[in-house]
């Protein structure tokens, strides 16, 4: 996990934003790219480069989502009725690992994925160990009783002063939450400007 944490901070500096809003993020101290020419602000980025960076920022924010998975989610969003960008975000935010992270059950998206894959999360009363499971309105997420006291969970509970997004509800004493509805882009608490329109334009080429 330490290796993952270090690499995620490098990603923040490389992409020029704090990807998860973490106070420990090295980007908050050195808000320029790593490397010899990191502080050179005269380097121009091409139109394609801007679109690519927007995609990389959004994909990295969701942790270990592969490029193939990310593109498949976009293609599904494109086939749905309504706005493709809003559909895209709705699908990303309905993933089980994302919901666990947004509920502050885990301190990072990486830890959320680990909790799910290790079988520590229940969905509607049953063990759920696939991070990419898509939740539906009314689905209930719960931490298994046997691990409610582990340090990772307790650390995250201390952060419950953070606001749970309005498309979720969460009860701290029982460590149980509910997926209330599909969110809009404006509902999602990204710590950076999520330029979803650029991602859509990139994948639509």
Swiss-Prot record:
GO biological process, one term: ribosomal small subunit biogenesis
GO cellular component: small ribosomal subunit
Gene Ontology MF: a single term: rRNA binding
Keyword Membrane included in the entry's annotation: no
Domain of life: Bacteria
Domain S4 RNA-binding positions: 94-157
Keywords assigned by UniProt, alphabetized: Ribonucleoprotein, Ribosomal protein, RNA-binding, rRNA-binding
KW Translocase (keyword) present: no
NCBIfam families recorded: PRK05327.1, rpsD_bact
Quaternary organization: Part of the 30S ribosomal subunit. Contacts protein S5. The interaction surface between S4 and S5 is involved in control of translational fidelity.
Entry function: One of the primary rRNA binding proteins, it binds directly to 16S rRNA where it nucleates assembly of the body of the 30S subunit. With S5 and S12 plays an important role in translational accuracy.
Family: Belongs to the universal ribosomal protein uS4 family.
Protein name: Small ribosomal subunit protein uS4
GN (gene name): rpsD
